[in-house]
Amino acid sequence: MALDAFFFIVSLFLLFPSPSASESTTQFCSAGRENGVGSCGVSSTRILIKGGTVVNAHHQELADVYVENGIIVAVQPNIKVGDEVTVLDATGKFVMPGGIDPHTHLAMEFMGTETIDDFFSGQAAALAGGTTMHIDFVIPVNGNLVAGFEAYENKSRESCMDYGFHMAITKWDEGVSRDMEMLVKEKGINSFKFFLAYKGSLMVTDDLLLEGLKRCKSLGALAMVHAENGDAVFEGQKRMIELGITGPEGHALSRPPVLEGEATARAIRLARFINTPLYVVHVMSVDAMDEIAKARKSGQKVIGEPVVSGLILDDHWLWDPDFTIASKYVMSPPIRPVGHGKALQDALSTGILQLVGTDHCTFNSTQKALGLDDFRRIPNGVNGLEERMHLIWDTMVESGQLSATDYVRITSTECARIFNIYPRKGAILAGSDADIIILNPNSSYEISSKSHHSRSDTNVYEGRRGKGKVEVTIAGGRIVWENEELKVVPRSGKYIEMPPFSYLFDGIEKSDANYLSSLRAPVKRVRTEAT
């Protein structure tokens, strides 16, 4: 037994070379690393959830849910089952689809370092917070899409929950165009991201964006944009440095909301010109939200994704005299002044914005200190994978801004629909994957970097308390979070291929045909000879 215990401790050390305080008290199952199965009580193949209120995006009902071998088999009242079934009592609680986070960056090399959360630690944190799938962004290797995909295949090998990939486009040539087609048809990628910021590294020009939009349209893939005017941001950064503003507040001052609004408007107009759907990631300002609202009102297919930090926080933290505190709030686009977050909440509750992500991109305080003397070198990113589901419930459902069905829609179902994996994901329906949470609306939570499951030693939601706690998480038919205990198995997560031509492409061909018929061109002209 002593030898077994020794190897168990060694395996934990290898998984977590830089553990946070919380990881020393949390159980991570390392059994079965080679074949993806374990024996720590997480692999029950039959589960009956009794007496809860089952909530989907379209309705809710009192019903039981029966799961076998990772699939929801039945959703109906008073299900009777035989022996060897794990029974969970959900009386007085909500039974919901597990959250799907459309926007994460795990094991990402960025700004001279790498995010502190890899796929295993980030996903473990997600499961503790009720998120059962995420979609991460693949960054090409020197512009090479295939090399980038292969690198992220390796990064994600230890995954403990299901995940998908978006792909970033950082340059353009015929090879990129061919690789996009291969990734869509053979690798299950149906979305491509274009950065309009980060001049000199990830940023693309308008001509490249236009080529990318055309290629996305032809492939049935969704074009996504990080919308900030990168040239103006670069100028703003120089201006701040010249003024002697080198701290985290300079980050916000150099990238004001107007630059996010301008880039959002530009991307929307170019997408309209090509007639292809557009997804705007991390909408942080009223300026950007207003542009999305105008486009949607006109009938354009534009998706707006706020992130939980932009909905909940404001930028006063960036002026904190303690660099360690201020720097942990640095992300791009920046967290905005008071008023923007509430406006984004209103837009989310009225359908102007469609779903909530996190942009989970974590660095510890040592990494953030890389920009101690120059805000331009502070690694951009905040946490959110573990906190999103709790914060949105407490902030928007408890306040009456959202119903329980709306909550499911913006945290799970709409993401599944947009990325064409519904109803496999995002639903409590017979035949859907058994990714399920049990949320107790009367239970409370408190957020702390000392107890969270991220490897980061900081948390931008430190000390927040609220109501509505995820008490049980089931991922792939396995109970992975229960009684405040996290039990996850490396290599138990699956890569989820996402097919092209989601519902957002419905009607595109017809509108193209209508456009062509409206041109009254080319005009047939009769050549007349001069007399």
From Swiss-Prot:
<dbReference type="GO" id="GO:0005794">
    <property type="term" value="C:Golgi apparatus"/>
</dbReference>
<feature type="binding site" description="via carbamate group">
    <location>
        <position position="193"/>
    </location>
    <ligand>
        <name>Zn(2+) 2</name>
    </ligand>
</feature>
<protein>
    <recommendedName>
        <fullName>Dihydropyrimidinase</fullName>
        <ecNumber>3.5.2.2</ecNumber>
    </recommendedName>
</protein>
<comment type="similarity">
    <text>Belongs to the metallo-dependent hydrolases superfamily. Hydantoinase/dihydropyrimidinase family.</text>
</comment>
<feature type="binding site">
    <location>
        <position position="359"/>
    </location>
    <ligand>
        <name>Zn(2+) 1</name>
    </ligand>
</feature>
<feature type="modified residue" description="N6-carboxylysine">
    <location>
        <position position="193"/>
    </location>
</feature>
<feature type="binding site">
    <location>
        <position position="103"/>
    </location>
    <ligand>
        <name>Zn(2+) 1</name>
    </ligand>
</feature>
<feature type="binding site">
    <location>
        <position position="198"/>
    </location>
    <ligand>
        <name>substrate</name>
    </ligand>
</feature>
<keyword id="KW-0479">Metal-binding</keyword>
<dbReference type="GO" id="GO:0005783">
    <property type="term" value="C:endoplasmic reticulum"/>
</dbReference>
<dbReference type="InterPro" id="IPR006680">
    <property type="entry name" value="Amidohydro-rel"/>
</dbReference>
<feature type="binding site">
    <location>
        <position position="332"/>
    </location>
    <ligand>
        <name>substrate</name>
    </ligand>
</feature>
<dbReference type="InterPro" id="IPR011059">
    <property type="entry name" value="Metal-dep_hydrolase_composite"/>
</dbReference>
<dbReference type="InterPro" id="IPR050378">
    <property type="entry name" value="Metallo-dep_Hydrolases_sf"/>
</dbReference>
<comment type="function">
    <text>Catalyzes the second step of the reductive pyrimidine degradation, the reversible hydrolytic ring opening of dihydropyrimidines. Can catalyze the ring opening of 5,6-dihydrouracil to N-carbamoyl-alanine and of 5,6-dihydrothymine to N-carbamoyl-amino isobutyrate. Involved in the recycling of nitrogen from nucleobases to general nitrogen metabolism.</text>
</comment>
<dbReference type="GO" id="GO:0012505">
    <property type="term" value="C:endomembrane system"/>
</dbReference>
<keyword id="KW-0378">Hydrolase</keyword>
<feature type="binding site" description="via carbamate group">
    <location>
        <position position="193"/>
    </location>
    <ligand>
        <name>Zn(2+) 1</name>
    </ligand>
</feature>
<dbReference type="GO" id="GO:0043562">
    <property type="term" value="P:cellular response to nitrogen levels"/>
</dbReference>
<feature type="binding site">
    <location>
        <position position="226"/>
    </location>
    <ligand>
        <name>Zn(2+) 2</name>
    </ligand>
</feature>
<dbReference type="GO" id="GO:0019483">
    <property type="term" value="P:beta-alanine biosynthetic process"/>
</dbReference>
<feature type="binding site">
    <location>
        <position position="105"/>
    </location>
    <ligand>
        <name>Zn(2+) 1</name>
    </ligand>
</feature>
<dbReference type="GO" id="GO:0046872">
    <property type="term" value="F:metal ion binding"/>
</dbReference>
<comment type="pathway">
    <text>Amino-acid biosynthesis; beta-alanine biosynthesis.</text>
</comment>
<comment type="subunit">
    <text>Homotetramer.</text>
</comment>
<dbReference type="GO" id="GO:0009536">
    <property type="term" value="C:plastid"/>
</dbReference>
<feature type="binding site">
    <location>
        <position position="282"/>
    </location>
    <ligand>
        <name>Zn(2+) 2</name>
    </ligand>
</feature>
<keyword id="KW-0256">Endoplasmic reticulum</keyword>
<dbReference type="InterPro" id="IPR011778">
    <property type="entry name" value="Hydantoinase/dihydroPyrase"/>
</dbReference>
<feature type="binding site">
    <location>
        <position position="380"/>
    </location>
    <ligand>
        <name>substrate</name>
    </ligand>
</feature>
<dbReference type="GO" id="GO:0006212">
    <property type="term" value="P:uracil catabolic process"/>
</dbReference>
<dbReference type="InterPro" id="IPR032466">
    <property type="entry name" value="Metal_Hydrolase"/>
</dbReference>
<dbReference type="Pfam" id="PF01979">
    <property type="entry name" value="Amidohydro_1"/>
</dbReference>
<keyword id="KW-0862">Zinc</keyword>
<dbReference type="GO" id="GO:0004157">
    <property type="term" value="F:dihydropyrimidinase activity"/>
</dbReference>
